[in-house]
């Protein structure tokens, strides 16, 4: 995969492209894209028997505060193939702290061009309460059995916060080149 050839999105931060690393409901394995090689590697096997509550990946050509591209959880009902690209709309952010520092997960939904299921979902609060609880529970506990690792949820933020985070990450990536 030539990551450099994949656009950040059609109209960032209103919509962005996400390269999927882990599918919804897949085996409890964390895959991570090696940005230099353009190849998916097994990062680790989750010690818990939990499965990702959405398709998980990153926005190309961004750099978050932790030095990696922005993480995104795409809320939808279909498992996507790792390595594929999906166009999404950011609707919020789950802010966490873990053993490595602050960690933020953008929450997004597929663009209306792909499915009408989420066309009226513009904020994370528009998702069903159970979906928000499942996302938070997953990220709060997916590292529970890994020695020396922990996660603390700090809270949720709206789409405006998510879009600002994306703009800042795009600028940070441009400066880093």
Swiss-Prot record:
Reaction catalysis annotation: diphosphate + H2O = 2 phosphate + H(+)
Protein location: Cytoplasm
Transmembrane segments: none
Keyword line: Cytoplasm, Hydrolase, Magnesium, Metal-binding
Binding site for Mg(2+) 1: 66, 71, 103
Pfam family, one: Pyrophosphatase
Predominant subcellular localization, coarse grouping: cytoplasm
Residues that, per the record, bind Mg(2+) 2: 71
Functional note: Catalyzes the hydrolysis of inorganic pyrophosphate (PPi) forming two phosphate ions.
Entry-linked HAMAP family: Inorganic_PPase
The protein, known as: Inorganic pyrophosphatase
